[in-house]
């Protein structure tokens, strides 16, 4: 309805999809021949954990969101498989923890085109923060930021540890001014500009639509987003009809950026994603999930994600019935 205010009159047609049925999902994709597909599905939302008592929430939160990767990965991976099976090449935008799910899919030949949020929540906040500190208009500020979902949650959620590496280059009116700032403070304080809770999801939605338009309309937009073509973490990217291209400044190589994001992933619950897509949980993540939920898993292969996701949901439901009514 709101699109009418902007002179836009899209046709909207809801269709029920069972993403556990890859064959039927493939048939639907072949029938509809979409230019782009956006995955907004997840089996268990992180925000349910906030409903637990504060001390228990804080304990589970300290396992990091990567602890719930089976729940975050399963449906998006099924959709990616259906897209591949269709033989078509739509832009695939994955919104579900794309810093960690996209690289798993990338290892098994199912890489989404791009993710959303995470670095793309941090980057506009950094620009806003610098504008506030300098009194300069946001339009005069440009940044190049390599960071991870971990940098987004560390200032916001209980139990996350500091020290995740990142890269930040700041320019004002084309002049490099990075040395004028404490970049760790900039990153932390910028994230704190967001209110607590889930209100930030409106910015996540903006990130999603921005990425969609940039590719469908071939805008060649220089922006930030996570998981381009299956890479871990977030990067400066250019989005166009060609898809996603990482665009780094000369001060940092792609290999260095990837290594930074892999190191950050270890502070987000994931020790390693192996070449065959096997996910290895960090030891602290394993211990906390075992202690709080009775969920015991040190590593898993992508094809095991579904069963583990249902096991995680059952463990959470059993725990939640004690506290959530």
Language model: regions and residue ranges:
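Long, compositionally biased stretches enriched for glycine and/or charged residues
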Residues: 137-325
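Conserved NAD(P)H cofactor-binding loop of Rossmann-fold oxidoreductase domains
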Residues: 40-46
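NAD(P)-cofactor binding segment of oxidoreductase domains
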Residues: 54-88
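Conserved Rossmann-fold cofactor-binding substructure of NAD(P)-dependent oxidoreductases
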Residues: 16-34
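Rossmann-like dinucleotide-binding core of oxidoreductases
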Residues: 77-84, 88-171, 202
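Glycine-rich phosphate-binding loop and adjoining beta1-alpha1-beta2 segment
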Residues: 1-22
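Glycine/Thr-rich phosphate-binding loops of Rossmann-like dinucleotide-binding domains
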Residues: 46-48, 102-103
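Redox-cofactor binding/interface segments in oxidoreductases and associated redox assembly factors
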Residues: 37-39, 94
């Amino acid at each position: 309805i709101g699109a009418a205010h902007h002179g836009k009159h899209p046709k909207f047609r809801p269709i029920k999809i069972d993403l556990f049925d890859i064959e039927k999902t493939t048939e639907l994709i072949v029938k509809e021949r979409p230019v782009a597909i956006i995955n907004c599905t997840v089996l268990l939302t992180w925000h349910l954990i906030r409903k637990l008592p504060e001390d228990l929430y804080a304990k589970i939160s300290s396992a990091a969101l990567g602890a719930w990767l089976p729940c975050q990965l399963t449906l998006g991976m099924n959709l990616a498989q259906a897209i591949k099976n269709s033989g078509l090449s739509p832009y695939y935008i994955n919104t579900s923890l794309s810093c960690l799910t996209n690289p798993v899919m990338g290892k098994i030949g199912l890489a989404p085109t791009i993710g959303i949020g995470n670095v793309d929540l941090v980057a506009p906040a950094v620009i806003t923060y610098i504008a506030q500190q300098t009194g300069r208009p946001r339009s005069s500020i440009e940044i190049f930021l390599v960071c991870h979902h971990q940098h987004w949650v560390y200032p916001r959620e209980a139990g996350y540890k500091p020290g995740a590496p990142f890269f930040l280059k700041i320019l004002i009116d084309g002049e490099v001014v990075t040395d004028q700032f404490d970049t760790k403070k900039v990153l932390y304080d910028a994230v704190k500009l967001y209110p607590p809770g889930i209100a930030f999801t409106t910015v996540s939605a903006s990130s999603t639509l921005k990425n969609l338009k940039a590719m469908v309309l071939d805008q060649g937009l220089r922006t930030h987003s996570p998981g381009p073509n299956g890479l871990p973490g977030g990067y400066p990217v250019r989005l166009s009809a060609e898809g996603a291209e990482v665009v780094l400044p000369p001060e940092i190589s792609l290999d260095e950026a990837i290594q930074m994001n892999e190191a950050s992933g270890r502070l987000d619950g994931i020790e390693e994603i192996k070449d065959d897509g096997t996910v290895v949980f960090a030891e602290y993540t394993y211990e906390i999930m075992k202690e709080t939920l009775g969920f015991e898993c040190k590593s898993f292969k992508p094809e095991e994600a579904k069963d583990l996701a249902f096991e995680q949901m059952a463990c959470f439901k059993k725990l939640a019935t004690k506290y959530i009514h």
